[in-house]
Swiss-Prot record:
Family statement: Belongs to the peptidase S14 family.
Function: Cleaves peptides in various proteins in a process that requires ATP hydrolysis. Has a chymotrypsin-like activity. Plays a major role in the degradation of misfolded proteins. Probably partially responsible for degradation of ECF sigma factor SigR prime.
Main location: cytoplasm
Keyword annotations of the record: Cytoplasm, Hydrolase, Protease, Serine protease
One GO CC annotation: cytoplasm
Enzyme Commission number(s): 3.4.21.92
Induction: Expressed from 2 promoters, 1 of which (clpP2) is positively regulated by the thio-oxidizing agent diamide, probably via SigR. Probably a clpP1-clpP2 operon.
MF terms in GO: ATP-dependent peptidase activity; ATPase binding; serine-type endopeptidase activity
Places the protein is found: Cytoplasm
Subunit annotation: Fourteen ClpP subunits assemble into 2 heptameric rings which stack back to back to give a disk-like structure with a central cavity, resembling the structure of eukaryotic proteasomes.
CDD domains: S14_ClpP_2 (cd07017)
Protein origin, superkingdom: Bacteria
Protein name, entry field: ATP-dependent Clp protease proteolytic subunit 2
Organism from which the protein derives: Streptomyces coelicolor (strain ATCC BAA-471 / A3(2) / M145)
Length: 218
């Protein structure tokens, strides 16, 4: 791979992933090398583009807390293209989003499925968005345990019922849909277009361009 200093791409090798380019930017302090994620972070944008597990949840929480400490009065944007994941990792990010002082704008690009759908809806009211061809998928949580003695399985069954009830309450809190309707809908996968998600109350608007009044994001 050829060097970035010669105007060419460098980045990690991966068979199933487009190689992330790195670029050099000259500043008054000298030369700095960036990747797109670092540049987005400087603009107070967190990109959640992976499955939600403990590792990715820790990354997102760390960025939320760091951006709050840097400026507690400026909005944080979370761009989402995720298939979802662990319920416990979801609740960790969710609680942190509610905990930090800045408003959290959420934008669905591609898909916000399962746990990611809850994070999309959990953004600051009025600042939850989706691109026109995005989709949102909601369903009941899956068991994160399933082996052991009969007594252990009973504990796991009770826990998944608790998680389901908690998920229903989260979705009802951050949407305009009654909890009874949500309880019925998540029996199986419920796939929503951007327009459907807007009607459901999971987002506040569908956007086609980033050209908007930046003062609303402060």
């Amino acid at each position: 791979m050829r060097a970035a200093s010669q105007g060419r791409y460098t980045g990690p090798q991966a068979e199933s992933r487009y190689v992330i380019p790195r670029f050099v930017e000259r500043t008054s302090q000298g030369v700095r090398e960036y990747d797109p994620y670092a540049k987005l972070f400087e603009e107070r944008v967190i990109f959640l583009g992976v499955q939600i597990d403990d590792a990715s949840a820790n990354d997102v929480m760390a960025q939320l807390l760091c951006l709050e400490s840097m400026d507690p009065d400026r909005d944080i944007s979370v761009y989402i293209n995720s298939p979802g994941g662990s319920f416990t990792a979801l609740t960790a990010i969710y609680d942190t989003m509610q905990y930090v002082k800045p408003d959290v704008q959420t934008v669905c690009m591609g898909q916000a499925a399962s746990a990611a759908a809850v994070l999309l809806a959990a953004g600051t009211p009025g600042k939850r968005m989706a691109l026109p061809n995005a989709r949102v998928l909601i369903h009941q949580p899956y068991s994160e345990t399933g082996r052991g003695q009969v007594s252990d399985l009973e504990i796991a069954a009770n826990e998944i019922l608790r998680m389901r009830s908690q998920l229903e309450e989260m979705l009802a809190k951050h949407s305009t849909t009654p909890v009874e309707k949500i309880r019925e809908d998540i029996e199986r996968d419920k796939i929503l277009t951007a327009e459907d998600a807007l009607s459901y109350g999971l987002i506040d608007q569908i956007i086609t361009t980033r050209k908007m009044d930046n003062s609303s994001l402060r």
